């Protein structure tokens, strides 16, 4: 009888990372997806990264995940977002050649050790004594396994909406999964509906680019993956246009025909990626909205007009596009649509992403209420790691808010749940100064090495980089100038007669790496990424010291367990409202309790005192 350690259902961004992570840990893994071209499919925009999202990609790469490496082999337009602000909120982003991205992903996965791929449809999951036993395919056959990672994306009872037209689909032209939705309902999971959308696709050959604004990428693309030296994929430009008053009039006149505004859609859409209908209604005083014209490939004339996601009827979509500068004669290749799908309340899962109800069943991606390729991939790699570690009877791998954006996301989901598609932002992290894109590998790769999910190749790269960091730091500490000489160069420092090292100078707000290289040309030979890392660490040194103290407090509270049988109503010094909230959420630690909305610092102090008195008294009896 064929049996796998881990089976992953779904070959999207969560699924491929889960499958690869499980396989890297040496567990016999099966990835089941409908067809080969589904592997790593970019269902919506052809891009990876962005503000906070780019940091997620770097964290996935730090754990030897695939996304960063694959985008570096298929990225056609790189841009660092937010670069005029501090490094803590920089957002690496790259447009992808959609077909090339899938091709590279397919090549990697089909040659991955310990990984089999089956093109089939899963209809059900066989459970015995609240434990995963097998998956059941549409042809009735069973494949037995120890663990299942469910990464279904928008396919759970998915419905596409284009105006009044409503059709069952998990993605346009692809059938949804009713079987697995029924499985989850039968097992008693709390299920609700969410919605997302995508814009129409346009034939780039029919666009008048002279009426648009050119958007160039970075002159020197900065790779996502630590395994990538340089980006050798040809780079191309994007373009920007905008809606007009005529566009807005057409949308307002046809709002009753929009699936969103006619009451046809029940699910809540993503707050930070609204449809064009939402923009016109909620920002009614705004005269125009920007539209980014993003090429879908080097040899593909399809253009993705980022900013006009819609569920309006096809004929209305055609009409409104004609009112946009540069698109007056544009040909629509495919209409935009909204898609509604099932998701499970993420409070039904643990921080390992294993469900609380069923042992061996893990959820990752949009099934947990998130939106975005990067959020899905971040969950996928954690689910795959933990499923494989469980097969091997090893301790789970848990990332916290203090170590990663992935940890922030999982903690938010499992603690608070979500009623709208969850998207990662830098503002969600209280430790974002230390959780930057540039130091993701320094935060996570060592942790990955300890559990065995890092390949030997990356381990060598990482070890070499760490040595180079120490050598470069030593060099920067040895290169110094007197304050008088610095003053002659126009660099303002306190004239105390002391020598100032390059690391000292990095703390000056106006001083940067380029100036350091100009003063000491020997630095040209050093790795620029390492120089930038040390520059940022020096620049933020005083702030980071305070943040590390906060992190130490956080970590101490994270390990301060709250007994499962605690009765909050017996703590007289906290209000009834807080007692009810704590009883409902059942936080496992003091740290989790503190993060629940409405829980005051005074109530946390009261709980700590109560635990010390009650449980120390009981232990002394």
Curated annotation (Swiss-Prot):
Xref: PROSITE patterns: GIDA_1, GIDA_2
Residues that coordinate or bind NAD(+): 269-283
Quaternary structure and partners: Homodimer. Heterotetramer of two MnmE and two MnmG subunits.
Function of the protein: NAD-binding protein involved in the addition of a carboxymethylaminomethyl (cmnm) group at the wobble position (U34) of certain tRNAs, forming tRNA-cmnm(5)s(2)U34.
Protein's cellular compartments: Cytoplasm
Annotated binding of FAD, by residue: 10-15, 122, 177, 366
Listed Gene3D superfamilies: FAD/NAD(P)-binding domain (3.50.50.60), GidA associated domain, C-terminal subdomain (1.10.150.570)
InterPro entries assigned to the protein according to its UniProt record, in alphabetical order: FAD/NAD-bd_sf, GIDA_C_N, MnmG, MnmG-rel, MnmG-rel_CS, MnmG_C, MnmG_C_subdom, MnmG_C_subdom_sf
Organism classification: Bacteria, Pseudomonadati, Pseudomonadota, Alphaproteobacteria, Rickettsiales
Cofactor(s) it depends on: FAD
Example of a GO biological process term: tRNA wobble uridine modification
Molecular-function GO term, any one: flavin adenine dinucleotide binding
Full protein name: tRNA uridine 5-carboxymethylaminomethyl modification enzyme MnmG
Organism of origin: Rickettsia prowazekii (strain Madrid E)
Metal-binding as UniProt keyword: no
Keywords: Cytoplasm, FAD, Flavoprotein, NAD, tRNA processing
Family: Belongs to the MnmG family.
GO CC terms: cytosol
